[in-house]
Amino acid sequence: MPKTERRTFLLDFEKPLSELESRIHQIRDLAAENNVDVSEQIQQLEARADQLREEIFSTLTPAQRLQLARHPRRPSTLDYVQMMADEWFELHGDRGGSDDPALIGGVARFDGQPVMMLGHQKGRDTKDNVARNFGMPAPGGYRKAMRLMDHANRFGMPILTFIDTPGAWAGLEAEKLGQGEAIAFNLREMFSLDVPIICTVIGEGGSGGALGIGVGDRVLMLKNSVYTVATPEACAAILWKDAGKSEQAAAALKITAEDLKSLEIIDEIVPEPASCAHADPIGAAQLLKAAIQDNLQALLKLTPERRRELRYQRFRKIGVFLESS
């Protein structure tokens, strides 16, 4: 989608920058209509816009990062697939009677290499979000994902997963259909796959819903994505009986890419364009593609046995604790 369309939804902290950019466009249009040279003034305003952009996006709080991760115009799995893959053929169904639209996947050609690309898929508007259950997969979604990963393993195709979900569907029907079992099965099986697995958090990485496709040789995060055991709203409601304290919870949960890199939960932070992924989706896709290419080339040099061993050790070492003296 064009950048202008992605600017129609503004977060509060983006508004000063948007107003300045609108002013620059107005001056440029008026100057063109009246054949007036305002290049010096435009240059000064653009310098101010660059400075303001840096001030805004370099000092974001965890709660503001969460807003960006949930931005309705933020690129989705399908957006990245379309921008990064040379070819794409979607595969459907879990072979158990369902085809969950909240988790999509298919065979693609990435940088000349056949791969399996799969991930959570949110909607673009209310109707689409309802159809895709707001990116919250049912058990069938995780079983479909595992079927596709088994297929990739059988044919020697690397697996690229894209994580963007507030969590797995927590409805009664999901529990009846074995939500916990479906996610646990994926966790176990992903450790045993021979092919390289690269997982990227592109928006929200919520709880077990994220982990269900999140066991990889490399786990990447876009700079303004989040990865958390529970949404800050849920955490605040549980700890303080007040969902209004979500901002406090967001800070305590350590949900940002920088926090998770320091804790060695993730391997790499993928930078975003100056105005973030929702404002420049093509730029974001180029940066992500380069990061995946580098990691994939490194992983392809390892034997399957070595990849499995390192993958297992990577997750075994997660977590720290303090001992009293």
Curated annotation (Swiss-Prot):
It catalyses: N(6)-carboxybiotinyl-L-lysyl-[protein] + acetyl-CoA = N(6)-biotinyl-L-lysyl-[protein] + malonyl-CoA. Residues 44-298 form the CoA carboxyltransferase C-terminal domain. One of its GO terms (cellular component) is acetyl-CoA carboxylase complex. GO terms for molecular function: acetyl-CoA carboxylase activity; ATP binding; carboxyl- or carbamoyltransferase activity. It is found in: Cytoplasm. PANTHER family: ACETYL-COENZYME A CARBOXYLASE CARBOXYL TRANSFERASE SUBUNIT ALPHA, ACETYL-COENZYME A CARBOXYLASE CARBOXYL TRANSFERASE SUBUNIT ALPHA, CHLOROPLASTIC. It is an enzyme of class 2 (transferase). The keyword Cytoplasm applies. Pathway: Lipid metabolism; malonyl-CoA biosynthesis; malonyl-CoA from acetyl-CoA: step 1/1. One of its GO terms (biological process) is fatty acid biosynthetic process. Component of the acetyl coenzyme A carboxylase (ACC) complex. First, biotin carboxylase catalyzes the carboxylation of biotin on its carrier protein (BCCP) and then the CO(2) group is transferred by the carboxyltransferase to acetyl-CoA to form malonyl-CoA. This is Acetyl-coenzyme A carboxylase carboxyl transferase subunit alpha. Acetyl-CoA carboxylase is a heterohexamer composed of biotin carboxyl carrier protein (AccB), biotin carboxylase (AccC) and two subunits each of ACCase subunit alpha (AccA) and ACCase subunit beta (AccD). InterPro entries: Acetyl_CoA_COase_a_su, ClpP/crotonase-like_dom_sf, COA_CT_C. The keyword Lipid metabolism applies. Disulfide bonds: none annotated. Keywords: ATP-binding, Cytoplasm, Fatty acid biosynthesis, Fatty acid metabolism, Lipid biosynthesis, Lipid metabolism, Nucleotide-binding, Transferase. Its EC number is 2.1.3.15. It holds the Pfam family ACCA. Belongs to the AccA family. It comes from the Bacteria.
